[in-house]
């Protein structure tokens, strides 16, 4: 697991195993997978399509349960938790960013970022203040009243990032967050993610095919035969 001897990883996947059934065939996607994510560290997950990147992200984010193994969030084992408790952890400790922004089209940028906080039951005045601060930090202070259709692709994805960190999560999981963007816009979105890692010390795991961006992160790992492999 490494890092500091007394430091607890934000997320630790221990001996994760995941199989899927396809007809009469069982496909092993993850096979004894281990991965530790540390506070303030950015990790690139680079592997071919179909290797299990999305499955690993879903398990790390408690969206999917492994067939065997344990997911620790802040040192707490999650396998024995109720669905209610797992949902609470997802809402408070984990942020998600996808290739498609998944913003609610009828809501403004501000309202989209307020939503995760309102679901937690925070006061409206608090959610407005927090949402404005994050959008301003990401250079979107002039776009808060715009709906997704009125924003560029890069702006939409930055709003999605703002929404993902609205509840100050411990870990940010991103699945090809720049995959639909041109190189220049992708660079701006990636820089926004890296700024947030430094400013908030959130742990970040990004699944990406973009090796240029991956090389700018603290660690690079791949998936080979269901195992996480550290890359030089």
Swiss-Prot record:
Under Pfam families, the record lists: ABC_tran
User: Where is ATP bound in this sequence?
Assistant: 47-54
Asked if Lipid metabolism is a keyword of the record, the answer is no
In its UniProt record, a GO molecular function of this protein is: ATP hydrolysis activity
Provide GO CC annotations from the record.
plasma membrane
Q: Which UniProt keywords are present, listed alphabetically?
A: ATP-binding, Cell inner membrane, Cell membrane, Membrane, Nucleotide-binding, Translocase, Transport
**An example Gene Ontology biological process:** protein localization to outer membrane
Q: How does it sit in the membrane?
A: Peripheral membrane protein
Q: Which SMART domains match?
A: AAA
EC identifiers of the protein: 7.6.2.-
Compartments reported by the entry? Cell inner membrane
Broad class of the protein's primary localization:
membrane
Q: Which InterPro entries match?
A: AAA+_ATPase, ABC_transporter-like_ATP-bd, ABC_transporter-like_CS, ABC_transpr_LolD-like, MacB-like_ATP-bd, P-loop_NTPase
Whether Nucleotide-binding counts among this entry's keywords is yes
ABC transporter domain residues are 11-231
Please explain the role this protein plays, according to its UniProt record: Part of the ABC transporter complex LolCDE involved in the translocation of mature outer membrane-directed lipoproteins, from the inner membrane to the periplasmic chaperone, LolA. Responsible for the formation of the LolA-lipoprotein complex in an ATP-dependent manner.
Q: How does it assemble?
A: The complex is composed of two ATP-binding proteins (LolD) and two transmembrane proteins (LolC and LolE).
Q: Which family does it belong to?
A: Belongs to the ABC transporter superfamily. Lipoprotein translocase (TC 3.A.1.125) family.
Q: What is this protein called?
A: Lipoprotein-releasing system ATP-binding protein LolD
Q: What is this organism's lineage?
A: Bacteria, Pseudomonadati, Pseudomonadota, Alphaproteobacteria, Hyphomicrobiales
Q: Which gene encodes it?
A: lolD
């Amino acid at each position: 697991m490494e890092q500091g001897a007394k430091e607890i990883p934000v997320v630790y996947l221990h001996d994760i195993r995941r199989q899927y059934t396809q007809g009469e065939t069982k496909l092993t996607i993850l096979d004894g997978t281990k991965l530790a994510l540390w506070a303030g560290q950015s990790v690139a997950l680079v592997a071919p399509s179909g290797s299990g990147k999305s499955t690993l992200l879903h398990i790390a984010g408690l969206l999917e349960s492994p067939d065997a193994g344990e997911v620790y969030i802040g040192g707490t084992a999650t396998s024995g938790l109720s669905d209610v408790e797992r949902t609470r952890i997802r809402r408070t400790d984990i942020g998600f960013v996808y290739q498609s922004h998944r913003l609610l089209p009828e809501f403004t940028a501000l309202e989209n970022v307020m939503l995760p906080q309102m679901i937690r039951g925070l006061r409206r005045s608090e959610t407005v203040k927090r949402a404005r601060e994050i959008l301003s930090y990401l250079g979107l202070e002039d776009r808060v009243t715009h709906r997704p259709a009125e924003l560029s692709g890069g702006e939409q994805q930055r709003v999605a990032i703002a929404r993902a960190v609205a509840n100050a999560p411990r870990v940010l999981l991103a699945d090809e967050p720049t995959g639909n963007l041109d190189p220049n816009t992708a660079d701006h979105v990636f820089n926004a993610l890296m700024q947030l890692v430094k400013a908030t010390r959130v742990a970040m795991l990004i699944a990406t095919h973009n090796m240029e961006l991956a090389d700018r992160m603290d660690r690079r790992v791949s998936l080979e035969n269901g195992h996480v492999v550290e890359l030089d």
